[in-house]
């Protein structure tokens, strides 16, 4: 896959750089090891980053069936060694019933009125994030997505009716969100993001709006959503509403480095090896080579097998990056058939 180039307008001049914080979520299980990869890649790819890297950690409580905190003390120590701050937060709305909600409630772990960029933990930083010219007054989010929601039923409401019902519910202007270059009832006409990254000038304001919309949709969905599943899509349904309500929208070309040469939302290592360019693989294997990293993350079996036992390279040899299947599900099926899907 050829990655989008950020172009000459991507890098901000030093005097124009804005200091900002980064938020990821860290918790017991897979995400604690992914957090190590994120932190290590940030330090290698952008050693000049001078903001705070905050790992939001959900705390045990009535919303969690089991303790969600980072369970490996070596992971906790390594994250701190990599300059991350582990900050607790309480789960009041979601928890184990909808762990994707951590990215919403975790915003409360950030200091108020300080610009932030949220990343899903399964992301690698592959370039100088500190030089991306964010306009923190105009929030945006990742466009690296497929038409995963809504799923249109044969005799049910269409895209327009479904999305308009959501904007109407919260008193938002629907028409202004449409991409009129796309045909009516084609999914890309409607404002829809991958929630793998997003940003704004204040995490509290963003988090409160995001939480209000997400819980409102969950607890009392508009009528046209009656046949729609909101698990796991709730965050991606509420996100465009929150961004639009705060004066944001689709990201401009100045942000092309995100999901381009500056960051990679890899999601599953099998997919990374299958479709990402050589630079991403090189960054992954470089940041996982030091013994202090290796001895910790190899405890997670998929990382051990994919990175250190060569299974990832076997996946990579299966595909031509210049001629990948058009849909991700086709990639997944081929990888699973080869018994190389690990997460």
Task: Please annotate each region the language model reported.
Residues 2-343:
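Glycosyltransferase catalytic domains, chiefly GT-A lineage
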């Amino acid at each position: 896959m050829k990655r989008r180039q950020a172009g000459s307008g991507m890098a901000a001049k030093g005097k124009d750089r804005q200091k900002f914080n980064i938020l990821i979520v860290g918790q017991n299980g897979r995400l604690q090891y992914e957090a190590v990869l994120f932190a290590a890649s940030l330090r290698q790819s952008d050693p000049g980053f001078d903001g705070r890297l905050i790992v939001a950690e959900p705390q045990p409580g009535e919303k969690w069936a089991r303790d969600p905190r980072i369970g490996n003390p070596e992971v906790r120590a390594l994250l701190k060694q990599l300059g991350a701050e582990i900050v607790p937060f309480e789960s009041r709305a979601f928890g184990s019933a909808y762990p994707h909600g951590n990215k919403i409630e975790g915003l409360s772990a950030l200091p108020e009125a300080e610009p932030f960029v949220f990343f899903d933990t399964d992301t690698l930083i592959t370039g100088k994030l500190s030089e991306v010219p964010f306009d923190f007054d105009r929030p945006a989010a990742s466009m690296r997505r497929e038409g995963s929601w809504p799923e249109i039923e044969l005799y049910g409401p269409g895209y327009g009716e479904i999305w308009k019902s959501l904007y109407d519910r919260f008193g938002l202007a629907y028409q202004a969100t449409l991409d009129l270059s796309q045909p009516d009832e084609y999914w890309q006409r409607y404002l829809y993001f991958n929630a793998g990254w997003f940003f704004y000038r204040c995490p509290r304001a963003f988090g409160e709006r995001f939480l209000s919309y997400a819980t409102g949709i969950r607890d009392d969905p508009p009528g046209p959503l009656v046949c729609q599943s909101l698990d796991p899509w709730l965050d991606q349904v509420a996100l465009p509403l929150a961004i639009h309500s705060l004066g944001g929208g689709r990201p401009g070309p100045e942000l092309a480095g995100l999901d381009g040469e500056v960051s990679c939302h890899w999601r599953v290592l099998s997919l990374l090896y299958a479709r990402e360019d050589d630079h991403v693989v090189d960054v992954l294997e470089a940041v996982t080579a030091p013994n202090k990293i290796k001895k910790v993350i190899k405890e997670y079996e998929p990382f051990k097998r994919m990175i250190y036992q060569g299974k990832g390279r076997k996946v990579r040899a299966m595909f031509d990056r210049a001629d990948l299947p058009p849909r991700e599900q086709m990639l997944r099926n081929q990888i699973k058939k080869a018994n190389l899907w690990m997460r």
